[in-house]
Design a protein with these regions (language model features):
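Solvent-exposed loop and beta-edge segments used for protein-protein assembly and interaction
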Residues: 2-4, 62, 123-129
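Short, well-structured alpha-helical interface segments that form or flank functional binding sites
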Residues: 34-41, 60-63, 128
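Internal, well-folded beta-alpha domain core
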Residues: 83-251
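Short, charge-patterned binding micro-sites
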Residues: 62-80
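Beta-strand elements of well-folded, non-transmembrane domains
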Residues: 12-16, 72, 133-141
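Acidic, Ser/Thr- and Gly-enriched intrinsically disordered low-complexity segments
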Residues: 31, 42-61, 78-92
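N-terminal ordered "arm"
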Residues: 2-53
Length: 251
């Protein structure tokens, strides 16, 4: 199967970010650097497309993040945020509500039930973040002809240069917007900061990027052993053995 020979680089920045470590999800505590999943989400927000059908979404491709470069040192800030204890319904449930198959159930900010309603939680977030992200397009079967790949690359480049996005990119939480600029190959770029850290097991993604159809499915958690050297975090391909994944059907 052909893959895109072209890589795309974005410089992204924002005031706040929180890439929550899964072992600390009640009181949020951020990784010191953006996760591959969050980086992929920024590329997706600019351009990601596929064929929609009743069974889900058949994407033309997925983004493979290859490198994350820190352009500012990680700095933490303690925040207290109002959150709700309930879980936002998935697409399948929303469709049942819209079709009248189920009665809509709102998320109440205040409730007599101790398991629902609002709560204040501590968040250890990052402030004044700036990264350079490098990724390439990995086409799905049936969409890997060279002319198709060139079309996807051109559409992303055009949209990114014009600052267009389907939804506002964000850094881990939707309250923390991310701003972006497309970087031309070879242009003068800021050097990564002098930061070295063995992060350990880091969240790679919450979806199975190998799947040809995206559904409102259970999370598919993958991890990798992350080490930042000289302000650079190299990301292995999703198919690499370095990325620890559950067996299909065991999520």
């Amino acid at each position: 199967m052909n893959v895109s020979k072209k890589t795309h680089a974005l410089e992204v920045w924002g005031d706040l970010a929180c890439f929550t470590r899964p072992e600390m999800k009640v009181e949020r505590f951020s990784y010191p650097v953006i996760t591959p999943s969050a980086a992929r989400g920024i590329f997706d927000a600019i351009y990601w497309e596929g064929i929609r059908d009743p069974h889900g979404m058949k994407p033309y491709f997925h983004w493979q993040v290859e490198r994350i470069e820190l352009l500012e040192m990680p700095r933490y800030i303690a925040l207290r945020r109002n959150e709700v204890k309930g879980i936002v319904p998935g697409t399948a449930k929303l469709n049942r509500w819209m079709n009248g198959a189920e009665i809509p159930e709102p998320l109440w900010a205040d409730s007599d039930d101790a398991t629902t309603g609002r709560t204040q939680r501590q968040t250890m977030a990052l402030k004044n973040v700036r990264y350079r992200l490098t990724a390439r397009i990995i086409p799905k079967p049936g969409f890997s002809a060279p002319e198709q790949i060139n079309k996807f690359d051109s559409m992303f480049e055009r949209r990114a240069k014009q600052g267009k996005c389907f939804q506002q990119p964000f850094f881990g939480c939707s309250e923390f917007p991310a701003f972006f600029e497309y970087l031309q190959p070879g242009e003068h770029q800021k050097q990564p900061v002098a930061f070295d850290q063995h992060i350990g097991w880091m969240l790679y993604d919450v979806f199975d990027l190998r799947r040809d159809v995206v559904r409102d499915d259970k999370p598919f958690i993958s991890l990798f052993d992350a080490t930042v050297v000289g302000g650079v975090l190299e990301i292995p391909p999703f198919s690499d053995e370095k990325v620890r994944k559950p067996e299909r059907g065991q999520v």
